Each structure stands twice: as structure tokens, then as C-alpha cells.
């Protein structure tokens, strides 16, 4: 790891320990007390709020260069955190790559809405894109952490149901194993600056399961069937507790 990387890692670890993020994540304090300033959409974009029956979405559209493809973004947060402004910024960055539209899904979260709420919302968002005229080969699924797990679970469900598959899957540090059984959960326990050194982090929270087995493939897609899925990109850091969730999937 570079000197710059070590400095950033140490800063994250210090902040996490000082703020006791593990307990605050688990009891909902962090989610309830985190207030953000209003997000300002760049002038070259239109950010359209879309009100679904049980959740909200936002469609970011470039005013000029529209490539005709769309990225369905599923945010992270351990299935207990709502969408934040950082993901709106991510949407802008995604769009600027090629002129993509970006549909960001503010899916329902636990503990108020355990599984399958978030999964159902992701599926409904994908169906909304199909009904809106996008073919599967013009849809890209992207997500990080819990959102990355949702991306993979959704793709497996679409294949199982014979529905149009997306063009590709992009997953950053996806949470694909809610049993936390991979070796990196132990090997990187002292190294991970965000989730390490606490058994009270979101990784060990069962609030999302809602009485279901953590080995169900649409909950932990690591235990699912990877055949006949679209091309997949996994990105994960070597010191993350979620490292095994990507390596084992490959």
C-alpha cells in the first residue's frame, strides 16, 4: 500500500473508532442524525424525481449528449441506510463517461422494511425501465456494498424468470455473503478501516433478513448460480472484510 493509501486508511480507522460507528449504525442513530444540505444538480443535467408506490427514484438525464443507455444504480448502506448525496454525485460521474442516463433507486430499508423489500424495489425499478422503452441490452446495473449484492441477486432473478438481462453488471465491494463466512471476515478484521474491529457493524446485523436464511441466493447471491449471467466487473480492496465476497464469486 502507498504512503497516501496508508494515511487515508488510518484516518478512516481513527474516525470510525472515535465516532463509534458500529453501535450507531446498528441502532439507527447514525441514519437518523445524518442531515445533508440540499443537493444541487449540475446545469447540464435534469434530475427528475419519480414516485413509485412504495419507494422513490431519481432519473438523471443529460440535456445534450444522451447515448441512449441507462445505468440502474443501487446504493450501499448495509440495507439499513437510505440514499445519500454521494450517490447523486456518483450518478453525475457515471453519466459523464458516455452520456448515460442514471436511475438511482432509494429502496426501502431495514429494520422497518426487511427482505424482500429492497429486492422487490430493485426489481420494480428494472421493470419500470423496461416499460419505459429500454431494452435489456441498453441497461447496466451498478452498485456498491449492499447495492452490489442487490445487483447480482437481481440479475440472477431476471435470468431465473426468463426476463431480459442487462448489458453488464458493475459491483464495487459487493456484499454477496450475509453469512459473513469468507476468510476475509477473519483475516481482514484488524485491517478494514471502516467495518473492522467491531462485531456491531452492519455486516453482522441480521435486521435485513426478516426471518429468512442468509444463504438464500437472492439474499446472499454468493450461494446462487452464476451461469448465463451478463459480463460482470468486481472491484474490491485487498484489506476489506468484504474481499471474500468478490473473490469467491469469481
Give the residues covered by each predicted segment.
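A glycine/proline-hinged amphipathic helix-loop "lid/cap" segment
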Residues: 1-65
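Alpha/beta-hydrolase superfamily serine-hydrolase fold, recognizing
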Residues: 51-250
